[in-house]
Amino acid sequence: MSKDKLWGGRFTQPTDKFVEEFTASINFDKRLYHQDIRGSIAHATMLGKQGIIPIADVENIVSGLKAILEQIEAGKFDFSVSLEDIHMNIEARLSEKIGDAGKRLHTGRSRNDQVALDIRLYLRDELVEVSAYIDLLIDSIIHQAEENLGVIMPGFTHLQTAQPILFSHHMMAYHEMLKRDKARMEDCLKRTNVLPLGAGALAGTTFPIDREYVAELLDFAEVTRNSLDSVSDRDFAMEFCAASSILMVHLSRFSEELILWSTSEFKFVELSDSFCTGSSIMPQKKNPDVPELVRGKTGRVNGNLVALLTLMKSLPLAYNKDMQEDKEPLFDTIDTVKGCLKVFADMVREMKINPERMEVAAAAGFSTATDVADYLVRKGIPFRDAHEIVGKTVRYCIENEIDIPELSLAEWQLFSGRIEEDIFESITLEASVNARRATGGTALERVRAEIARAKEGR
């Protein structure tokens, strides 16, 4: 018999020392201690209510678990690799403290449904925190959009100047992305907030448990409906990691733009010194390490998603030891996403923009060429013909090393007799921006309305 194991009755030889270390998860699943104890208290309370164990035992179990919780939080609990995981560590310590009552705690329960409960409880709490961090970044974005309303910058396609837009409009694009990210987290919470406890190892339990009562004690919205699925389901973890990967892609795109915009070539923004570092050899350098790291950590979070998907892709029902590998990718994703959101929210709020530099860049690169085409359409010329006319005009400007605003009326009329004096008021940056008044456009009135709408939704 393997006497030091709670499951050792069937075994005649001790576990190999390296195998013990190789299979143990306590080094990373100990962060689930609070959820494990909370779940055990609810389970014990239900066992007592149902008359499955004596009320006196329930009282001893609850007081013992609370004492263990205090011991862990005080840093005085010695976790043992030989006890494999957080569940066995706590149960063994409980039995040591209160005797046989502690050994009755696991009645009607398996580690399979126990760990499924712990992860759901943990992720449920973390989803609320992640959503709160998303809100912090949204607040910073709205702050920048409101503070700099009216500043015009170039909008890009293919990283080439395309059309003038408001800087605030650009900021609010990230607001839209983050709104979707938050909605995905909220949707994930719905599917996470389901109680698996009571499924046993895979087939349920022979004891007259009350799962709905446990769900009520632990604030779950409902209970799972199939015991096999209950212990083998990690969809909620994969869904969170998928939502996190999309979120990190958004932060990575934002990071890329801030990195570009903060270069001496762009000079659109300046990041606070608090969020940059210097060079060990080049004294003039101010490196945007924070957005670069966020961009880099995106690959890490994406990798965690792939790890979970690959982990689960060929597992037969129900529980398999492979599933122990679900926690590290999940925990790392949670930690990484929260850290990135926190630092990004502070960095965005404190960054300074350079309106003059943005406006100069917005005026270059024939950015109002589309406005000329639209002008010609309003003069009765079909759009494809207008497009051709403006293309020839741009080529003329390139050959003569001038930009669209520098053309005289006589030069304009070389390309179309429909062009009149009013062309000049149609191709200013302000006119270009404010002409785009349809819902979702960059016109000042539209962007102001979207900022107000975003603030109302906070």
From Swiss-Prot:
Ordered alphabetically, the record's keywords are: Amino-acid biosynthesis, Arginine biosynthesis, Cytoplasm, Lyase
Give the residues annotated as coiled coil. none
As its record notes, the protein acts as a catalyst of: 2-(N(omega)-L-arginino)succinate = fumarate + L-arginine
For this chain, the annotated S-S bridges are none
Q: What is its EC number?
A: 4.3.2.1
Which molecular-function annotations from GO does this UniProt entry contain?
A: argininosuccinate lyase activity
InterPro entries tied to this protein: Arg_succ_lyase_C, Argininosuccinate_lyase, Fumarase/histidase_N, Fumarate_lyase_CS, Fumarate_lyase_fam, Fumarate_lyase_N, L-Aspartase-like
Which one GO biological process term can you cite for this protein? arginine biosynthetic process via ornithine
Q: Please tell me whether the keyword Cytoplasm is annotated for this protein.
A: yes
Domain of life where this protein originates: Bacteria
Family in the record? Belongs to the lyase 1 family. Argininosuccinate lyase subfamily.
PANTHER family for this protein: ARGININOSUCCINATE LYASE (PTHR43814:SF1)
Xref: HAMAP family:
Arg_succ_lyase
Question: What is the recorded name of this protein?
Answer: Argininosuccinate lyase
Identify the species of origin.
Answer: Geobacter sp. (strain M21)
